[in-house]
Amino acid sequence: MFSSTYFRLQEAIGNGLPGTQENTHRDFRNPLQTFDSCLILNGRERISSSKTLIINYNLYLCTIIRRKNNFKRHTMKKTALITGITGQDGSYLAELLLEKGYDVHGTIRRSSVDFRERIAHLEGRPHFHLHYADLSDSMSILGVIGKVRPDEIYNLAAQSHVQVSFDSPEFTADVDAVGVLRILEAVRQLGMAATCRIYQASTSELYGKVEEVPQNENTPFHPYSPYAVAKQYGFWIVREYREAYNMYCCSGILFNHESERRGETFVTRKITLAAARIKQGKQDKLYLGNLSSLRDWGYAKDYVECMWLILQQDKPEDFVIATGVQHSVREFCYHAFKRVGIELEFTGEGMEEKGIDKATGNVLIEVSPDFYRPTDVVNLWGDPTKAKAKLGWNPNSTSFEELVNLMVDSDMAKVASDGAAEKVRTNLEEYLEKGIVK
């Protein structure tokens, strides 16, 4: 007997008698057939997004049609593959998917340096797995996708530093542009185009020399760095595969998103770490670039939820992921130092601008020409209207000040911990030198 919440039996004919085909249903005798976008194994064991219908009923001919408005993708345990799992977004996304019951697989590169700090607490869990792969190597990508055969792929791996892209444009293009193609083509070559959904992490840097404020899904791109140009290729190749091969693949155009796990080379983390170090007497001054640069900053933990939602829809679409609120680098500095009890006032303009401790008169922030980009994007401001309306996503779950405070509090604890560890090391060295400890 056939039974399904998502399908109903239209007709069953025994002994292999010829069936009929009408506009509303089909009769199949072949045990392997295509039907809409669903996969059925033995009529009952598994239902998921696919273009394959498999029915094993021996001599019986069955016709099954999908119930209208009743098909959901959350009917079975799913498997996700995350590239860039050791990064800020990858680690938060892994946590989210594990909470939702996924089997989570992540790719890491072979390196002499261990970058697993953000996911160390996940290793050892039964549904968390790591694989060696590199976006610059087609065979490693093909191998891991073929081994895991995921329902969803989240491509978060990238060379994501704008300044580095000027120094290493070829490497940036190989990873951020061709790397995306390698994933798409691997999925297609493995025959998974109908069963695997792909999320591509795109960037607000695509808008570059902005022609419209705020920026939405229809705003023209004007990339202003090798990084942005590479990401633009990634965006368009995803759309091309979606249209040419009917693949469920889409891009999330991510505006700046930060967290306690942000890399220390990014401007927001440089600010919060410097505020903590200056407060604890470990640093004298912070050097930055253009303090007037405007950014739309959100919380990474909120943004990975939007990534997941993008892959749960009936049809693939691209979305802007942003808060819809702008702040300057200067504002970020002000709130970060305020959190540690230092009130800043700013004097001067451009290269001459300085951030001064109002209480002591000490200059704590200066502008350095070393941090000015050859071409600087100054007015990125995202419009998340589509994501809010179609995905039901709330981009303002965490406010700007809450985000800054989370980051500063984390760095205050880190600096204090590092200081305590350094003190222990210093004392141990002294004891060893004096022969107190052997």
Model-derived regions: residue spans:
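C-terminal substrate-binding subdomain of Rossmann-fold SDR/epimerase-dehydratase oxidoreductases
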Residues: 12, 99, 106-107, 133, ...
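Low-complexity, intrinsically disordered or signal/transmembrane-proximal segments
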Residues: 6, 10, 21, 25, ...
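Polybasic, lysine-rich low-complexity intrinsically disordered segments
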Residues: 22-23, 30, 34, 47, ...
